[in-house]
Structure formats: C-alpha cells, structure tokens
Amino acid sequence: MAASVGRDERLRLFLAIRLPEPAVEALAGWQARELHGRVVPPENLHVTLAFLGSRPAGELPVILGVLERAAADAAPLRLDVTGYRESRSVGMLTLADEAGATAALAERLHAELEQLGVYRREARRWLPHVTVLRFRERPRLRPEPPSLGWMSSDAAAFLSRLHPPSPAATAARYEVLDSFRLGG
C-alpha cells in the first residue's frame, strides 16, 4: 500500500489484467490513427476484472489476498480484439476470451469479494474489453479494429486518482498497488 495512505482513507480501486508492452504500443498506434477526442493514454490501458469504487484503505489487504489467490489459480490469458463499440461515455475494443478463462477469473473475484462485503456486482453482464476512448457526446465512430491478440500474465490492483479533465489529459491517473502473476 502506498506509504501516504492512512487506514481510514478511502481509495478508488479496481482489479484488472495488465496488457503486455507490445500490445500497449500497438493499441496506442491504432488509437492515434483511428480515434479522435479524449483517447485513453497508453499507461491506462487494461482489462477491468472488477471495479470496487471507493473503499476504506483498511480493506486493501483483504482485497489483495483475494486477487493473489485467484491469480495463482488462473493460467496466463489469451485475449484477441474482436471489434469496436461505444457505450454512453466510452469507446471500447471488445475481446475474445479463449475458453472463458478471463470470465472465470472475473466471476471468481466478483463472488469472493461480494461474499466479503467489499464488492457489489454490477447489473450489466461483465464483458472483456479495453476502454480506448472517453467522451461526453457519443461520436459514433466506426474504426476498423486492430488485428491484435496477446497473452496476459498478470493481474493487478489499481488505485484510480481522479483529476479534472483537460483537452490534452485524461481525468484519471492509475497507480498499480500490487500485481500477481497468473498461475503463481
């Protein structure tokens, strides 16, 4: 845990699969060619497994324990880009989840964290994706998705710090609090 964080402080947390550097570089190049607006910076690209929201810092050891055990029991994950779609506020690349392994990892985290009272399941179905663009007004882009796939070998707990967005900057900065190798 960051040294400057007190036990009673609230942390905006999420658990995610980190992308390998070659995939991050390829996606950043694709974003520069195909997207316009507030693109997600390369250092913020990830596949969210569980968004926990604002949690007391004292819960972090329990959350990290759940992530560590789940990651140890999972194998490295094969993810492939299948398309681009937009929701009300984000553009995302959807991913094929080989053999449902990523969905199984997400489901395990959701169930265990929910049982511990540190997570509330979202109403919508979990979808493996990488958020690549944020917007206030849906641009209705139709970019050709990149032909890209990768193996991801670790999962991490992230701290999300919100800042007012500017035309050149994203509204959030993410900090890895801890990461765990998939398969131990």
Description of each model-found segment:
Residues 1-184:
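Histidine-dependent nucleotide/RNA phosphoesterase domain, centered on the 2H-phosphoesterase fold
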